[in-house]
């Protein structure tokens, strides 16, 4: 058995934590009092259940495990408190014996007349020792699917493997059975021939033997080069070994990413045009993206102009569509970041470079381990629960999308070593305490108040003028990705699509270049500014101004909670039309109640009393110890 609590696999702690979370308040506090004596820290952990919806038992054990608590201490404490069910779950676990998966080999040839790839190094060593070599080949369309050998960690449908790697598919009625599994990527044929296979000589010639002058970027697992074939530019991703990678990792990664790329066909997913598994290297071939990555454009690298808001919102909408499409195929990208959102000549986003993860069926395979120094740069886009627990779920992609949305909204890099805090996610999540203390957070939700704080402090000023309520809608979408554990991508995408539709309609009436690009609020366009914080008003106050609104504007499609955005956007459009067609609307005399000044301490007490009546706050937190 593991010596320390932090050495227990995360899936082992899942059941005990759920069991402990279901205890009564008295029993749980009795257990917690033996673990932690600092009441302030205990209250902080307890509040995480209400604010962030996390397991308080897991947070407690994490805190205890970081102080070198042992598994024996945990089991003894559970037995002393007669919590035998949780103790037995831990005692029943035994470390599974380490199983070494055989390294999949590549075919000696993919065409009878031209060899393409060699077997892996391990297979060569076994052959020298006289041991039989098991070759995993890619059968043709006429081969039986059962003969295709797939890696143990990747189990796509059996008919996908043979039909994904060949383009000469039969046109008979028998092919109808494969209509849902045959990737549509096969229509994107490379110029090297009528197949996705590229020979080693073709790749070497196109890249000038991977000349350093052609290198575009260098990543953790691959280097990216630019090359030409028949006058057409291509991008070549050359996989490479890392210092801490295991033997055969390139081959496994190559096969996994190849299978996933060939299953995807979406306008916002970067298509694969070919691949090469040569003796000296493994490479993927992609179309060349003229506008680089979203990260480059946001940071203005190469002297590029700042992206205006309509294009920024359109890129965000395309990214969310791509991730939603992958999740529909049960594929977890797990590498969503602004540097992997590539832009073509029309600034259409293309999500690239997945880490090749299929949604696993086995519960234990949902957890992953990652080397620290490989993981540092990606940590800026990963949620805290994944960093602690290592459980790979779709929420990892959704959280990463929230960080990209925040980068687009604020123009702040996801990671900056010269900034405190270093990660943008920590900067945004630090707004939660002040947001929860706001008097309107109980009515409009923590995400909405948090979004207002983010817009007031960090909204990008150099991309032109963005209406306040559109900015808050985008910030709310980002906050939903960052905070909610069961966020619906459809809900987030609906909000972003509503803003995109409104900006597109406004751009048709007034070109975006005619708006002020130097400030976030233009002095040429009137704004509804009051001396009070408008965030304290709920949606009903927004509807009350509709009777005196000016010319009607087309309402945006309502989908998944977009009603608030539709009313707000109408107010913004009507207020801009007021500058040309008429005087300001009359003020409602019933709205003067905001002038009543309430003592801040009294207001806080009134809020706590309401929470106490709703059983969301106990007496200790209400009156203090």
From Swiss-Prot:
Residues 13-94 form the Death domain. Residues 210-503 form the Protein kinase domain. Keywords: ATP-binding, Nucleotide-binding, Phosphoprotein. Residues 169-181, 516-526 have a biased composition (Polar residues). PROSITE patterns: PROTEIN_KINASE_DOM (PS50011). One of its GO terms (biological process) is cellular response to lipopolysaccharide. It comes from the Eukaryota. Residues 111-181, 513-539 are annotated as: Disordered. GO terms for molecular function: ATP binding; protein kinase activity. The keyword Nucleotide-binding applies. GO terms for cellular component: cytoplasm; nucleus; plasma membrane. The modification Phosphoserine is found at residue 144. The keyword Coiled coil does not apply. InterPro entries: DEATH-like_dom_sf, Death_dom, Death_IRAK2, Kinase-like_dom_sf, Prot_kinase_dom. ATP binds at residues 216-224, 237, 337-340. Binds to the IL-1 type I receptor following IL-1 engagement, triggering intracellular signaling cascades leading to transcriptional up-regulation and mRNA stabilization. The protein kinase domain is predicted to be catalytically inactive. Interacts with MYD88. IL-1 stimulation leads to the formation of a signaling complex which dissociates from the IL-1 receptor following the binding of PELI1. PANTHER family: INTERLEUKIN-1 RECEPTOR-ASSOCIATED KINASE, INTERLEUKIN-1 RECEPTOR-ASSOCIATED KINASE-LIKE 2. Belongs to the protein kinase superfamily. TKL Ser/Thr protein kinase family. Pelle subfamily. This is Interleukin-1 receptor-associated kinase-like 2. It comes from Pongo abelii.
């Amino acid at each position: 058995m593991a010596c320390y609590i932090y050495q227990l696999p995360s899936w082992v702690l899942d059941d005990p934590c759920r069991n402990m979370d279901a205890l009564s308040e008295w029993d749980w506090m009795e257990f917690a009092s033996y673990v932690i004596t600092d009441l302030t820290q205990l209250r902080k952990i307890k509040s995480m259940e209400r604010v962030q919806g996390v397991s308080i038992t897991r947070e407690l054990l994490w805190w205890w495990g970081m102080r070198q608590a042992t598994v024996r201490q945990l089991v003894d404490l559970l037995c002393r408190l007669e919590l035998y069910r949780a103790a037995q779950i831990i005692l029943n676990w035994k470390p599974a014996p380490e199983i070494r998966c055989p390294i999949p080999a590549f075919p000696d040839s993919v065409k009878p007349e031209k060899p393409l790839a060699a077997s892996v190094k391990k297979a060569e060593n076994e052959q020298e020792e006289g041991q039989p070599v098991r070759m995993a080949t890619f059968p043709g369309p006429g081969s039986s699917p059962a003969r295709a050998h797939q890696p143990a960690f990747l189990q796509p449908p059996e008919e996908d493997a043979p039909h994904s790697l060949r383009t000469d598919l039969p046109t008979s009625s028998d092919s109808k059975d494969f209509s849902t599994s045959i990737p549509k990527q096969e229509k994107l044929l490379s110029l090297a021939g009528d197949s996705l296979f590229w020979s080693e000589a073709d790749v070497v010639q196109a890249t000038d033997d991977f000349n350093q002058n052609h290198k575009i970027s260098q990543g953790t697992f691959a280097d990216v080069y630019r090359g030409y074939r028949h006058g057409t530019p291509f991008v070549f991703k050359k996989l490479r070994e890392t210092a801490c990678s295991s033997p055969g990792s390139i081959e496994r990664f190559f096969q996994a990413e190849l299978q996933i790329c060939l299953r995807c066909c979406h306008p916002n997913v970067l298509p694969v045009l070919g691949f090469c598994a040569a003796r000296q290297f493994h490479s993927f071939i992609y179309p060349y993206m003229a506008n680089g990555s979203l990260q480059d454009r946001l940071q203005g690298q190469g002297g590029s102009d700042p992206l205006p808001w309509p294009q920024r919102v359109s890129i965000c909408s395309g990214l969310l569509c791509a991730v939603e499409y992958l999740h529909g195929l049960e594929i977890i990208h797990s590498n969503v970041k602004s540097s992997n959102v590539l832009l073509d000549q029309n600034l259409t986003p293309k999500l690239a470079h997945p880490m090749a993860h299929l949604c696993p069926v086995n519960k234990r395979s949902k957890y992953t381990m990652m080397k620290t120094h490989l993981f540092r740069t990606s940590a800026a886009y990963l949620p805290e629960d994944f960093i602690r627990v290592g459980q790979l779920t779709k929420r990892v992609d959704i959280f990463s999308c929230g960080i990209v949305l925040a980068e687009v909204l604020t123009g702040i890099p996801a990671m900056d070593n010269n900034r405190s805090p270093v990660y943008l996610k920590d900067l945004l999540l630090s707004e939660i305490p002040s947001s929860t203390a706001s008097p309107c957070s109980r009515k409009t939700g923590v995400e909405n108040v948090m979004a207002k704080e983010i817009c007031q402090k960090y909204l990008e000023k150099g991309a032109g003028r963005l209406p306040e309520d559109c900015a808050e809608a985008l910030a709310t979408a980002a906050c939903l990705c960052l905070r909610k554990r069961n966020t619906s991508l459809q809900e987030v995408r609906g909000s972003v699509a509503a803003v995109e539709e409104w900006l597109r309609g406004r751009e048709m009436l007034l070109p975006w270049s005619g708006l002020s690009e130097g400030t976030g609020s233009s002095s040429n366009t009137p704004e509804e500014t009051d001396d009070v914080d408008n965030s304290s008003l709920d949606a009903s106050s927004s509807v009350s101004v509709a009777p005196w609104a000016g010319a009607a504007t087309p309402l945006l499609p309502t989908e998944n909670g977009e009603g608030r955005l539709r009313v707000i956007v109408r107010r913004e459009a009507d207020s801009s039309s007021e500058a040309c067609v008429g005087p300001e609307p009359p003020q409602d005399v019933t709205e003067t109640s905001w002038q009543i000044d309430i003592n801040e301490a009294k207001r806080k007490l009134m809020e706590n009393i309401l929470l106490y009546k709703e059983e969301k706050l106990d007496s200790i937190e209400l009156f203090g110890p």
